[in-house]
């Protein structure tokens, strides 16, 4: 058996196209142009590339894109002032502060300062709490993308056994809540979990989000399981160069899993696409319009 490859590039492109169609509709019917503001502190090269990608994809979807670049030595007060200004700006419906922030800045205070209605990263305590309570909320983009990828294989997750390996606030915890909302039966595992291979072996759905290269081995998997690899790490190759890998030993898993996301080309493709979804949903909610069809 060779696993089906879940192509994140194709699924993300389809999602972006559907977002663009909905953006055009709300613009035509309601004169509403969703706007996304991204705040970048410092000049980390990887973050700059990511922010540029967000801006390009935002504009390609027909949305307004606003970028605010601040120096690495910006004060906490000045950063919070930028967030407050964006909270008040009626042209901005989504605010994303690129993380991680430089040392000396209080990340929690910055996240808490974002208007929950514009919190398209889904990290504000109001949104995290609503998600945990099973209420409508803006959800973090990577978990949301992971669910969409899973549903490309299993349109209904009801009754399926899922394991989430990793308990971060950004991925693991919100992913558990999204799975519960889909009526899956969820186990959350972490570095202190006993018999992790045994826990994984029972799961129909495996989500690996620990940031440990190729930690999940092929013989851990239940035959036919769907594997969503959320981790990404760069490891050395024999020729002295490096390569990107996920948290799952991909070649081993191919012969056991029923379906699997590659790294790269899987979950990472979905993150920005889901950011566009959240921005569109936020814009419609703020304007008092029905939830868009994405």
Swiss-Prot record:
Tell me which residues bind NADP(+).
Answer: 166-168, 191, 232
One of the GO BP terms on file: purine nucleotide biosynthetic process
Q: What keywords are annotated for this sequence in UniProt?
A: Amino-acid biosynthesis, Histidine biosynthesis, Hydrolase, Methionine biosynthesis, Multifunctional enzyme, NADP, One-carbon metabolism, Oxidoreductase, Purine biosynthesis
- Under Enzyme Commission nomenclature, its number is 1.5.1.5, 3.5.4.9
Q: Which GO terms describe its cellular component?
A: cytosol
So which domain of life are we looking at? Bacteria
Would I find NADP among this entry's keywords?
Answer: yes
Q: Name one Pfam family in it.
A: THF_DHG_CYH_C
The biological pathway it contributes to is: One-carbon metabolism; tetrahydrofolate interconversion
Tell me what reaction this enzyme catalyses: (6R)-5,10-methylene-5,6,7,8-tetrahydrofolate + NADP(+) = (6R)-5,10-methenyltetrahydrofolate + NADPH; (6R)-5,10-methenyltetrahydrofolate + H2O = (6R)-10-formyltetrahydrofolate + H(+)
MF GO annotations: methenyltetrahydrofolate cyclohydrolase activity; methylenetetrahydrofolate dehydrogenase (NADP+) activity
Keyword Zinc present in the record's keywords: the answer is no
Report the family membership.
Answer: Belongs to the tetrahydrofolate dehydrogenase/cyclohydrolase family.
The record's HAMAP family line, in alphabetical order, gives: THF_DHG_CYH (MF_01576)
Q: Subunit notes for this chain?
A: Homodimer.
Q: What does this protein do?
A: Catalyzes the oxidation of 5,10-methylenetetrahydrofolate to 5,10-methenyltetrahydrofolate and then the hydrolysis of 5,10-methenyltetrahydrofolate to 10-formyltetrahydrofolate.
Please give the name of this protein.
Bifunctional protein FolD
What organism is this sequence from? Bradyrhizobium diazoefficiens (strain JCM 10833 / BCRC 13528 / IAM 13628 / NBRC 14792 / USDA 110)
Q: Quick one: which gene encodes this?
A: folD
